[in-house]
Amino acid sequence: MIKFLFKGLMRDRSRSFFPILTVVIGVMLTVFIYNWINGAEFNFIDSSARFNTGHVKIMSRAYAREADQVPNDLALVGVRSLMDKLQELYPDMIWTPRIRFGGLLDIPDAQGETRDQGPVMGLAVDLLSPGSHEPRIFKLEDALVRGRVPQRAEEILISEDFARRLNVQPGDTATLISVTMQGSMAIANFTVAGTIRFGVEAMDRGAMIADIAAARTALDMENAAGEILGFFADFLYRDPDARQAAARFNSAYNDDPDEFAPVMDTLSNQAGMADLLAMMRMFSRLVLVVFIAVMSIVLWNAGLMGSLRRYGEIGVRLAMGETKSHIYGTLIMEALMIGALGTLIGTAVGLAESYYLQAHGLDIGFMMKNASLFVSNVMRAKVSPVSYGIGFIPGMAATFLGASISGLGIYRRQTSQLMKELET
């Protein structure tokens, strides 16, 4: 029966071409948009984790309340012992201390006078310790534009766009003017080892990357850090695991009234990420519902048109004794065949487009000029195992619904009127 119905569909293009084309377009768009949203979500999570939040972040309670202001006077102290404790409690995670700071970067001329200066967003990380993961987390080798990565504590990296505005070359001296942990003025000289471009507008506008040892000396933060970031070993964020780790850590300090006691927060609870990710997932589900609804309506209309063209055929089949239920069932089987074929073609086309966008990306830097989010300027799709099957939901559901609704007209045909219909 299935082979017979399939041959009938292939021989009569009026019954198959338009419905298959509708399913192909709908499934292709569903697969592509799903992968696009998947890629955007991964982009947000990956960029935010690497540059800002980690998968989990440990701060003092007082610092956490004012984290947007980067209050280093409320930073964690006794960081070495806390790091040892974290390695013992969570040996499968990567832990790294960081210091955020703001200030002015002053570029002197040959006489030592100010030639140019600009506001800088500083980030002190562990660049030089043996086995440090920070160069890999920041992908410094890939981000390097000019010069080299720091090899000594007094060397820094600055963003390429910032360096061009200040006319700074690798090897030049730069003076950081900032504030110490105690609130006094901090002045320290550094050498620009190289320039970087992360492709993240929030970092590329005016970032400075320094080794944490030199920053601690400059900011009077010995054995202190504003934040300790934790990453899963595979660098893939898993919210349930992160929440479990945070709950376990925080339970040990629930009864501690000290404002400087450490507190762990997850990526999803920082910088509005939970709302952003929830919105993206809701949009992904909305895409499925919309395409199922639209395709069902289109295929319903196509089924009604097909019923008009096949009005006489259905009448003959009824006159020959074929039951209405059997005819209705064959119409649904034909629709499911159309849905399966259209879904396979649409999925293949959608995956091809997604793989291309995953490899090459789409530069949206012109839209991110004033962005404060830590998100890459190059948006990429991300193909996952779900991508291969997501198209079957709208492809099969829409064809089934369309055929089910349009085929109900069969039950309104009166057997007593068949001969009169055939005579006309």
Question: Where would I find each of the regions flagged by the language model?
Answer:
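Short helix-loop junctions at transmembrane helix boundaries
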Residues: 345-392, 404-407
